[in-house]
């Protein structure tokens, strides 16, 4: 009798994706982040579902309903902080996952890569709308500032902003629709994840050397299931330390003040994971220019397959490119720091220099160094 795992129409798909999947024998811990992102998504959907049972998307009661969840609902505080800090863990894993892709040249699987970039946009949109829901000061002013950026679009800008707001300012209609979108987007993300995996399994995984590994494959289970479980345990450990010991470490104190349209907070800033993009936005004095730079800072990831000039796929054997890659990482840390600082000297000029360097490294320096490395190796 044939194993049901290999014959059943539904179980067969799971088998080919997670059990009998041929995987390279040398993939490192950097390949754990895909499964960790899957776990993050599951945690976010489950905690979000339980929060939605008690949350009300009305300007008069939204803030109170979040307070009610934390005070009166059984383990409501735990669910709420797991959801808030789960988002931070999600973005840490996302950034590391993208960084891994850049370092090891995984972007040469361009369908998988492009869907990954679309996923990044979708997760960022979801996180932004989620931040608006508690209806604190930073929720309200963050929503006002970020949605207002669309007014920079010529001709249709103002109409578009009012259409998104559902009125002439961020109000009840805005909150209600943001809640609706925040609820539906994770399911769209889940569907996109399946497409992402579908394209990945067409080609098979990349590996640290960047070489074809068809001659040396091992089954995913038990080797990488065990390895992934270790990653998951570490993820949950870090998340729970964050949730139970310092749940507000990554949040903004201003969000514990109910939204007040008549009182602007001294420093409007988004959550930490958007600060690098926010710094790029602020570094350009022109509104439309800033918005374009903001979008391009993420969209530029789609250009990596075109900008790849090296004869080698991975950066494993390219020390000059490695050096530039880590300078890019340091630059992103600098941008994140600048995004959280007030708009004054010397932060303005540091932000502008870091923004220029970000685009310069990706568009000019990395491709040039790759060509130089080809010459060094007489290729």
Curated annotation (Swiss-Prot):
Localization per Swiss-Prot or TrEMBL: Mitochondrion inner membrane
Keywords recorded for this protein, A-Z: Electron transport, Heme, Iron, Membrane, Metal-binding, Mitochondrion, Mitochondrion inner membrane, Respiratory chain, Transmembrane, Transmembrane helix, Transport, Ubiquinone
Annotated GO biological process: mitochondrial electron transport, ubiquinol to cytochrome c
Regions that span the bilayer: 33-53, 77-98, 113-133, 178-198, 226-246, 288-308, 320-340, 347-367
Gene3D superfamilies in the record: Cytochrome Bc1 Complex, Chain C (1.20.810.10)
List of residues binding heme b b562: 83, 182
GO molecular function (one): ubiquinol-cytochrome-c reductase activity
Matches recorded under InterPro entries: Cyt_b/b6_C, Cyt_b/b6_C_sf, Cyt_b/b6_N, Cytb/b6-like_sf, Cytochrome_b, Cytochrome_b_C_euk/bac, Cytochrome_b_N_euk/bac, Di-haem_cyt_TM
Binding site for a ubiquinone: 201
Cofactor mode of binding and number, as noted: Binds 2 heme b groups non-covalently.
Recorded coiled-coil stretches: none
Membrane topology: Multi-pass membrane protein
UniProt KW Heme keyword: yes
Binding site for heme b b566: 97, 196
Family annotation (PROSITE patterns): CYTB_CTER, CYTB_NTER
Cofactor: heme b
Entries under Pfam families matching the protein: Cytochrom_B_C (PF00032), Cytochrome_B (PF00033)
Keyword Iron found: yes
Function: Component of the ubiquinol-cytochrome c reductase complex (complex III or cytochrome b-c1 complex) that is part of the mitochondrial respiratory chain. The b-c1 complex mediates electron transfer from ubiquinol to cytochrome c. Contributes to the generation of a proton gradient across the mitochondrial membrane that is then used for ATP synthesis.
Note in the entry: Heme 1 (or BL or b562) is low-potential and absorbs at about 562 nm, and heme 2 (or BH or b566) is high-potential and absorbs at about 566 nm.
Subunit organization: The cytochrome bc1 complex contains 11 subunits: 3 respiratory subunits (MT-CYB, CYC1 and UQCRFS1), 2 core proteins (UQCRC1 and UQCRC2) and 6 low-molecular weight proteins (UQCRH/QCR6, UQCRB/QCR7, UQCRQ/QCR8, UQCR10/QCR9, UQCR11/QCR10 and a cleavage product of UQCRFS1). This cytochrome bc1 complex then forms a dimer.
Protein name: Cytochrome b
Protein's organism: Neotamias siskiyou
């Amino acid at each position: 009798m044939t194993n049901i795992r290999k014959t059943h129409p539904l179980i067969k798909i799971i088998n080919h994706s997670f059990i009998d999947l041929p995987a390279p024998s040398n993939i490192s811990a950097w390949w754990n982040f895909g499964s960790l992102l899957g776990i993050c998504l599951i945690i976010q959907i489950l905690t979000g579902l339980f929060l939605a049972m008690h949350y009300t998307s009305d300007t008069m009661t939204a803030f109170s309903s979040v307070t009610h969840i934390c005070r009166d609902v059984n383990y409501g505080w735990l669910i709420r902080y797991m959801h808030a800090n789960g988002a931070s863990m999600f973005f840490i894993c996302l950034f590391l996952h993208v960084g891994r892709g850049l370092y090891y040249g995984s972007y040469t699987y361009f369908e998988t890569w492009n869907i990954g970039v679309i996923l990044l946009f979708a997760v960022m949109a979801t996180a932004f709308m989620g931040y608006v829901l508690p209806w604190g000061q930073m929720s309200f002013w963050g929503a006002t500032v970020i949605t207002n950026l669309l007014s920079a679009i010529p001709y249709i800008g103002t109409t578009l902003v009012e259409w998104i707001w559902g009125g002439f300012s961020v109000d009840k209609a805005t909150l209600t629709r943001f809640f609706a979108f925040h609820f539906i987007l994770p399911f769209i993300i889940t569907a996109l994840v399946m497409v992402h995996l579908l394209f990945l399994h067409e080609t098979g995984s990349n590996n640290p050397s960047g070489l074809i590994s068809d001659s040396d494959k091992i089954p995913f289970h038990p080797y990488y299931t065990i390895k992934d479980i270790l990653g998951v345990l570490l993820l949950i450990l870090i998340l729970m330390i964050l949730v139970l010991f310092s749940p507000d470490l990554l949040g903004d104190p201003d969000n514990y003040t109910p939204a007040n349209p008549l009182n602007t907070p001294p420093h409007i800033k988004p959550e930490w994971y958007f600060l690098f993009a926010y710094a790029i936005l602020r570094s350009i004095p022109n509104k439309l220019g800033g918005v374009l730079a903001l979008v391009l800072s993420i969209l530029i990831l789609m250009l990596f397959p075109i900008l790849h000039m090296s004869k080698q796929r991975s950066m494993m054997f390219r020390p000059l490119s490695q050096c530039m890659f880590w300078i890019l990482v340091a630059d992103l840390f600098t941008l994140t720091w600048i995004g959280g600082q007030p708009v004054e000297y010397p932060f303005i000029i540091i932000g502008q220099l870091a923004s220029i360097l970000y685009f310069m490294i990706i568009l000019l320096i990395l491709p040039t160094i790759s060509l130089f490395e080809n010459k060094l190796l007489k290729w």
